[in-house]
Amino acid sequence: MASTMMTTLPQFNGLRATKISAAPVQGLASVQPMRRKGNGALGAKCDFIGSSTNLIMVTSTTLMLFAGRFGLAPSANRKATAGLRLEARDSGLQTGDPAGFTLADTLACGTVGHIIGVGVVLGLKNIGAI
């Protein structure tokens, strides 16, 4: 069996191919049809804009950003202490927001909102509600 497989493969001597034998290929590999396994829960599915998955993700992210801006950020800024002041310069993260909601806060709250949304979507898919 190994000798027939070696005769059907091309042989090389340096960069030049040597003569290929014309022996017929006998049962080296059988082609099996591809079968789909599972229901594709881990695959990415592009739904329309008003799909339930999209609405859950948008709602959870929006609620987390709203909670961060109006609930979490003002209380965090009130409890902050002065800390060590070595040099009085602008950090580059400050915005004109009166509550002090910065870019870092936006990214953090958006990330937490996405994590909550993914958990809700996967949980609902697991019980079959979506």
UniProtKB/Swiss-Prot annotation:
Residues 1-46 form a transit peptide. Keywords: Chloroplast, Membrane, Photosynthesis, Photosystem I, Plastid, Thylakoid, Transit peptide, Transmembrane, Transmembrane helix. It holds the Pfam family PSI_PSAK. GO terms for biological process: photosynthesis. GO terms for cellular component: chloroplast; chloroplast thylakoid; chloroplast thylakoid membrane; nucleus; photosystem I; thylakoid. It comes from the Eukaryota. It is a multi-pass membrane protein. The chain crosses the membrane at residues 48-68, 103-123. It is found in: Plastid, Chloroplast thylakoid membrane. InterPro entries: PSI_centre_PsaK_sf (IPR035982), PSI_PsaG/PsaK (IPR000549), PSI_PsaG/PsaK_dom (IPR023618), PSI_PsaG/PsaK_pln (IPR016370), PSI_PsaK_pln (IPR017493). Belongs to the PsaG/PsaK family. This is Photosystem I reaction center subunit psaK, chloroplastic. It comes from Arabidopsis thaliana (Mouse-ear cress).
